[in-house]
Amino acid sequence: MRTPSRAFAGAAALIAAALVLTMGPGSVAAPGQDSDPGGPGPFPGDPVEVKDKDSRTGRAAPTAQQRARADEVGARARWNAYGTPAMLVSTGDPLATGLSDDPVAAAEAYVAANRDLLGLTARGAAALEVVTVAPIGDGAAVLLRQNFGGLAAGRDGLLAVGVRDGAVWHVSSSLARDAGQPAAATLSADEAAQIAVADAGVDETAVQGVELVAVPVPQRDARAAYEVVLIGNDESQPVGFTTYVDARDGSVLVREDLVDYSEDNPAWEVFPNTPPVDYSSTDTRVRWCFLPGPGCQEVVGTPASPLAWDVNSTNLKPSETTLGNNAFAVHNWFSNDPFTVGKELATPRPNREYDYAWTNQWLRERCSPAVFESALRNDIDAARANLFAMHNRMHDWSYHLGFTEVTFNLQDSNFDRGGKQNDPEQGNAQAGGVTGGPPTFAARDNANQITPPDGHPPITNMYLWQPIAGSFYAPCVDGDFDMSVIAHEYGHAITNRMVAGPRDGLSSPQGMSESWSDLLAIEYLAEHGYAPSGSRAFTIGEYVTSDPDAGIRNYNMSASPLNYSHIDYDFVGLQVHASGEVWSATNFDIRQALIGRYGAGNAALQKSCANGETPVTSCPGNRRWAQLMFDSYLLMAVSQVSMVDSRDALLAADMIRFGGANQDLLWNAFAKRGLGEGAASNGHTDPNPTPSFASPHANEAAVTFAPVDEAGQPVAGAQLFVGPYQARARAVADTAAATALGTTVQVVPGTYELLATAPGRGHVRIGPIALGAGSAVTLTVPMPTNLASSAAGATASGDGINLVRIVDDNEATNWASLGSPIAGKQVTVNLAGDNAHRVGRVQVSAMLRPPVTGDPDPGTQGRVSALRQFRVLACAATPANDCADAADFSLVYTSPADAFPSVAPRPRAPELIIRGFDIPDTRATHLRLEVVTNQCTGAPEYAGEQDADPRANTDCSTASAQARNVRVAEFQAFAVQ
């Protein structure tokens, strides 16, 4: 087993104003490919091209009357582009009372009485029809949709009303003000389909369905449009869209990307979680039976599936293979196109004993492509059976939490219970097994879920994993056997169907969709008793990555330092996987707090709740949290939501289901992660939202930031951050006269790690420090001069490009040497001042950054190009020696070989951020930072031939162009104190 990284293990911490900061376990992120031609990808966490498009322009402002009405009812309002409420959030009291106990009648009465607040004309209000009514405990979420002269709204036009006992607690909408009949279509459905095909860059075989709908447009009448569902044929990346084509002028109004980047009693042999994570070939599968019977280790049938999993709903007979009402599983070895669905089901078993052989062949034969032609066929039957069983289990578990026919779930037959049918989960096992891999590594090291609108069958692709030079060092394993990955991908289907109704899907770079999928996966495993103990219970992808700590993420959510000031923290930029980790950490805290209030129960109670046998009001805290998550999905009628929107929906779900019993707990947990009552986001794409650490249910501590220099004098221009990141993070206090931020910040009680920075002062870590309720704390932070700072007068010379950026006190920029051997590459810093200094400490950052157009180093920065080991040399200039020659410098320090540690599958942000190193007391006017290795050339886990695939070499130093690139963000130097 590979050893998980610890971000500060084995390295001296930075200058500390209080206790030395020990950071939580490090973790995964994504491989960069800045100069490797034809490289693979994207892998989990990589930047992915945004393919959504909305060509509708204009924005209607809410009227003064609307704003006044919102204030009158005590609602916190956010407005959409139509000038109607995107969110009306209760601030304590209901938004309306005295309504009918019938949810639909209450919602309709609310609309009728609040047209002035909602901004609707009489015709706009009358055009609403009920889409679904989803129970939330004793309340419900009522989803209404506008009709425009007989045409249902295809995109937007939705209103979600959360009601309980005749009171409205939450409103979300994408309503148009009016609902007049659009001008009649002049294009045919076929013409619209051709336009959508051309716009998406796919062929005509991609068209899955065409329907005439209405699409509202801000400040204009709604347009008749054709909704065209496309499933494409691009082998390099999944391509699928719902495209709305104007039915009169042929323009593409909206294009939405559908892809998210993970006998009578039948029995299945399955891995409930994963095969052994020591990668032995011990078969630890258990026998699941649909009904009780001899030899069954677990009974899995529940009322969520009226038919046994392998019964064909068209003839009510057993399929005797991996096909049933909820899902089917096939192999798709011969196509890298994620939108194709294989044809070959598992080998039939007339006795319905799906106990196929598993030999661990892909791992034992080290990713050899010869496995596909062997008698064992790479354990494909076992893979199909495992994937099929896991999809059925997710169907049943989520059904008991509210993902049912009326909330647009995945079933071939809906048994006349509502919703559209003919859409079971289509599972491709070992997708692209034969055609994928080297040289492009298509169909490797990933998984995806494609979720079209209700009534169109979704597709999920599970891939094989293998090491890829300079990119992603996975073990040779099959993703069909890692339930955290399978459940994660199924989670995308859940949220894309439940949030914003059956058509709109879910789109936000702030990453809640990725986070929700992670959270659903860990909760499923926990409730069923399949999760490992300790922090590994919160790892996504341990088996497919060999990292028991963080898996495919940057952090294990149970030990994450992230908060809402860190949305853009990762060097891939604002990206759903990394940004979503903020939401995961927040929800982990909420889950733990609810367990603290309601207990964890025992294994029997957890399983009973998971199977829907025990009502949630009698379940442990974690099940209550899971239920609130599902309830919150139904309260969001907008697909493009921010974390603040999602926070408000979760708070409203608690008001509706539990009568607000947990508002204090929820608010305090949100505030601890920067999503407190003052948090704000400028839309769903805001990379720099406003954090708030204040709660309406807490007596906050007041922290006053007071940085001082060596003489005890105040430091101007300093910034204070909550957590370990400066680059692309948002400060919570500062001493800059030109900003409105101020020196004091209110924070809920708790323990915090902080970071201070200032021009000419470098980085100072603070804490952990405990802040008590109601305390007033003056945080005096010593900030000595960074002798290697350009702001203090230092200058840099040497190899490479962007030399000034290694001495700018800013981890958001970096120096690079590109395209030549890296060992010995150096930057020499002429230290601040005219005299020699006694230097006893340096601080170095290997942090990378997103692409910057026009920069000398403009592109994506490969992860393994980050510095790993370095040396420090010194020179003290004299009248006879100006430190101009290499011979003038003496070696004073060699860092540990893993100064910036990373392990498989790849480097990630926590391992690369700034850290401190004590060096011998050195008299110097000049210091030289010299590269020994980067991550590619120096990390043992990226070295050597790691598989038996003859088509590619896995050794990073010889097979990746990143071996010739190296980057450093900061070099800082401090005098002996």
Enumerate the language-model features and the residues they cover:
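Preferential activation on post-signal-peptide N-terminal prodomains/segments
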Residues: 25-190, 194-200
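Structured interaction patches on ligand/partner-binding surfaces of diverse proteins
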Residues: 759-784, 939
